């Protein structure tokens, strides 16, 4: 026991240090449910109201739940073998029409209405079922208004088991299991519910006389006290496993869970039970509900134990029970039922009690949320505890946690997200919904809206989740956007299991483009190139939210750009808006214009006249150019001057490249013909045109001093061609 107390103290210390922080950082995914009780009209409906008034009242309840920060409603639709919906199996509820079995007039279906209205507010709808209770109080059983002729207590009294002042459907009868399963599947098949939810009404506490049922179907359980207890637990097991199998086969996305009382078993051995008082009510033995087996076997998607004790309560301490349930989740969801109804009673006088319990839930990895009992007490707001939930604990919305064992396929992503400014500074978002899959599990049911002041927003950060829309409407109005403050938005699609798609594009509520101001820039080329940055031409660009980046239409310049150049400066602001303006960039430098002069002649005649030519490069642009000749073979070049002394006939082309001081290059080419007129013995070869068709030309060799006279007569230097 000493070790147990030390462990409890350690748990308290860890919890006290951690759950406050956890509370300040609410998770992105967390079930936040509210039980809405219809039995005795505890929360709804008022049986004397008109259908229109009842609808308005239910709408107000759902509005209140949504405003509190909830994401799931658990509406009691069958409290004592009756129906808050149109059923061929059980009569209309007394608490709806003031007469059991009488349909509402004018006709309406409260369950269908509740589903639609809950979904319209972006919440899940769970149909809350009392599986076995048939007559809540035998003192009123004879009242025909409460129990109509078609009620099971009238049609099949042999199915009932009386325990104290309560009558239940006998769990040991196969026909009872058939009936309850049929009722549940009637709801599942005809209504688009998100979940089926059982509460803790199994075998009630008290003397149970079920000998006849046991004797008729003992199924091998021995006729001992322990055997009878195991038989009763097996009766419940048979229904739980059957309902689970039936739901999975019909609509595998529908969630099935049970909310038992808060203590499974009491034991100092955690493998058996929780460290709670041996005298506390333990549903394993008092209600014959083996809930741990159900979750171990995967027969339920979640348990929601009603841990209706305050932190530090002797014998049934909240801070000792929650860790035990956390350790027994078996890879299913574990929610905690919270006792809102006890606020401002003995032990519950702290306005932070419920908020602290939620903080403790969040500090345990396998606790996936909580359900509040019940709506009227949230509405009553004792000690302003609901105000604290609304303003702090549930200030940011949360998505329901995913159930990977039910499915892992997410819907397609939304596209074409756009933002516009609505009335009163509201930000209107609209997008294109993804094309729905033929697979019901992948169809889009809702959208999650995210908002952040960071463009690269973290979708897993709970503070960035703004809302979950109703149904699959591809639009949303952010009425919480503060005037003068700017945000980024994106959207994801959610399927029935709240599995999330990839994100859409990101938009913002900044619709004002940047104010781009420019200045002119002047650049001097170096090595034939120069460059600028956006800052060189930015003359003080500004934006209402902030400039994210500046860019220029071109940043590099060459010798071809010498002179004035138009450049666009573009500014992208944080909201994704872009604007641009022109600037002039003056590029300084000189482009050479080389020319080549040849002297003393334009050609070389080997054997006659000058045998060496001088090629001289110059620049018409007046640049102080540097020159390079190509090809250099056969030239004696030094800077701008090159000497050409050929030794053979031919046509010789030479290129000179001029480079300015700024690294700009240009070329000029000259071609020098070389004629071979050498005849030997110092004579020069000439070709005379004879005019004869048989002998059109005649080659002669003459002395150099006679060449000019022959040239004047039409002779040409060199040998005759052909």
Q: What feature does the model see in each segment?
A:
Residues 56-82:
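Catalytic domains of carbohydrate-active enzymes, especially glycoside hydrolases
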Residues 179-183, 189-198, 202-276, 281-303, ...:
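Active-site neighborhood of glycoside hydrolase catalytic domains
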Residues 83-98, 133-163, 200-223, 269-279:
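Aromatic- and acidic-residue-enriched segments that line the glycan-binding/catalytic groove
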Residues 288-292, 296-314, 330-406:
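Substrate-binding cleft of secreted/luminal carbohydrate-active enzymes
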Residues 442-484:
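Recognizes extended acidic, P/S/T-rich segments that occur
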Residues 512-641, 646-714:
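Proline-threonine-serine-rich low-complexity tracts
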Residues 389-441, 483, 496-512:
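Pro/Thr/Ser/Gly-rich low-complexity, intrinsically disordered linker/stalk tracts
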Residues 37-55, 132-186, 190, 285-289:
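Active-site-adjacent "subsite" loops/lids of carbohydrate-active enzymes
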């Amino acid at each position: 026991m000493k070790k147990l107390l030390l462990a409890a103290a350690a748990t308290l210390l860890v919890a006290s240090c951690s759950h406050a922080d956890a509370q300040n950082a609410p998770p992105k995914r967390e079930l936040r449910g509210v039980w809405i009780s219809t039995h005795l009209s505890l929360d709804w409906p008022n049986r004397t109201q008109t259908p229109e008034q009842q609808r308005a009242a239910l709408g107000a309840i759902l509005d209140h739940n949504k405003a509190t920060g909830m994401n799931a409603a658990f509406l009691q639709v069958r409290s004592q073998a009756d129906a808050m919906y149109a059923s061929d199996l059980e009569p209309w509820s007394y608490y709806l029409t003031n007469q059991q079995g009488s349909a509402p007039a004018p006709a309406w279906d409260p369950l269908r209405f509740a589903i639609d209205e809950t979904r319209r507010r972006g919440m899940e709808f769970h149909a809350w079922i009392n599986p076995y209770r048939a007559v809540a109080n035998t003192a009123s059983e004879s009242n025909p208004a409460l129990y109509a002729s078609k009620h099971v207590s009238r049609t099949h009294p042999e199915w009932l088991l009386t325990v104290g002042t309560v009558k239940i459907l006998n769990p040991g009868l196969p026909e009872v299991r058939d009936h309850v399963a049929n009722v549940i599947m009637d709801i599942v098949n005809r209504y688009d519910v998100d979940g089926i939810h059982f509460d803790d009404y199994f075998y009630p506490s008290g003397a149970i006389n079920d000998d006849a049922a046991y004797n008729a179907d003992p199924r091998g359980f021995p006729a001992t006290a322990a055997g009878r207890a195991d038989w009763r637990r097996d009766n419940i097991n048979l229904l739980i496993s059957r309902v689970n199998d039936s739901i999975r086969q019909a609509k595998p996305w529908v969630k099935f869970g049970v909310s038992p009382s808060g203590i499974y078993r009491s034991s100092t051995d955690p493998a058996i039970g929780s460290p709670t008082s041996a005298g506390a009510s333990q549903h394993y033995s008092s209600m014959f509900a083996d809930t741990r087996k159900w979750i171990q076997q995967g027969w339920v998607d979640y348990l929601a134990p009603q841990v209706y004790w305050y932190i530090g309560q002797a014998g049934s301490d909240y801070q000792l029970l929650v860790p035990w349930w956390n350790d027994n989740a078996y890879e299913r969801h574990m929610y905690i039922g919270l006792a809102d109804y006890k606020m401002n009673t003995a032990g519950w006088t702290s306005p932070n009690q419920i908020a602290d319990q939620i903080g403790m839930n969040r500090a345990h990895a396998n606790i996936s949320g909580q359900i509040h009992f019940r709506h009227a007490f949230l509405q009553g707001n004792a000690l302003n505890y609901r105000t604290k939930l609304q303003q702090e604990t549930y200030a940011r919305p949360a998505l329901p946690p995913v159930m990977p064992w039910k499915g892992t396929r997410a819907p397609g992503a939304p596209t074409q997200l756009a933002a516009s400014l609505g009335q009163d500074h509201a930000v209107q978002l609209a997008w294109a919904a993804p094309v729905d899959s033929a697979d019901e599990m992948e169809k889009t049911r809702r959208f999650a809206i995210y908002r952040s002041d960071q463009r690269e927003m973290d979708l897993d950060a709970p503070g960035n989740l703004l809302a979950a829309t109703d149904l699959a409407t591809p639009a949303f109005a952010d009425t919480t956007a503060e005037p003068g403050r700017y945000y980024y938005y994106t959207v994801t699609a959610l399927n029935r299991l709240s599995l999330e798609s990839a994100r859409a594009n990101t938009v913002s509520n900044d619709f004002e483009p940047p104010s781009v101001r420019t200045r002119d820039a002047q650049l001097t080329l170096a090595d034939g190139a120069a460059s600028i940055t956006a800052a060189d031409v930015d003359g003080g660009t500004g934006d209402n939210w902030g400039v994210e980046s500046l860019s220029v239409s071109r940043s590099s310049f060459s010798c071809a750009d010498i002179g004035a150049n138009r450049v666009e400066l573009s500014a992208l602001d944080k909201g994704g808006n872009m604007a641009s303006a022109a600037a002039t960039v003056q590029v300084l430098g000189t482009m050479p214009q080389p020319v080549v002069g040849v002297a003393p002649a334009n050609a070389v005649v080997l054997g006659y006249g000058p045998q060496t030519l001088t090629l001289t490069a110059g620049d018409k642009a007046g640049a102080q150019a540097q020159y390079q000749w190509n090809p250099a073979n056969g030239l004696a070049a030094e800077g701008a001057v090159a000497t050409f002394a050929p030794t053979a006939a031919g046509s010789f082309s030479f290129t000179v490249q001029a480079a300015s001081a700024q690294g700009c290059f240009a070329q000029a080419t000259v071609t020098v013909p070389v004629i071979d007129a050498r005849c030997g013995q110092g004579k020069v070869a000439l070709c005379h045109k004879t005019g004869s068709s048989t002998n059109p030309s005649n080659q002669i060799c003459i002395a150099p001093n006679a060449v000019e006279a022959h040239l004047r007569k039409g002779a040409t230097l060199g040998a005759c061609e052909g």
